[in-house]
Amino acid sequence: MENKFIIKDNESFFKCRKLDQYMSNHKGYIAGGCFKDIFSNKKFRDIDIFFETPEDFNQALDFYRKNEDYVFVYENDNAVCFSNKNTKKKIELVRSRFCGVEEMLKGFDFTIVKFAYYKAIDGDNTEWKYMYHPSFFEDLTNKKLVIDDTSSFPVNTFERTYKYRKYGFGMCRETKKKLIELLQGVNIDDLGKDLYFGFD
């Protein structure tokens, strides 16, 4: 199924404006699970910030290392994490993959995490926008785990279904079928890599 994402300006979702403070002073974009929590009226614990290039990542890393409002938490091959001293929110600067917003969302497994807040830059003009999957709100409301395209890391996706079950989410029939087919093609030698490099 082809992904045709919806794009809205940053005035469309007032409850997401709390993320504005985490969008400044870097070229990254926020995507993934925090939007699931925001639109479910729950407190989000962490924010994943992605980047188009390694240079953009390094610029953001330098900013947060020097920012007295943040404290370093941990670092691994996938990301570097900082915590805001005032809000206690954790931000993860993701470096496991560099690409644009739409390409990144296509790489996410479930429709309920295919949501991003980004800066659309056209010359000297910068607009803050949202991009999300057409069935994001429907699947979130119905607590459905839907793989609309494919999963690059099916074992990781399978593991994540257990996490979501604790919050009342369940896979639709088509997703179960698709995930079973994907798992059959997994090389046993790649299990560790699949779990480690999967996207949130």
Where are the model-predicted features located?
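Catalytic cores of the polymerase beta-like nucleotidyltransferase superfamily
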Residues: 1-200
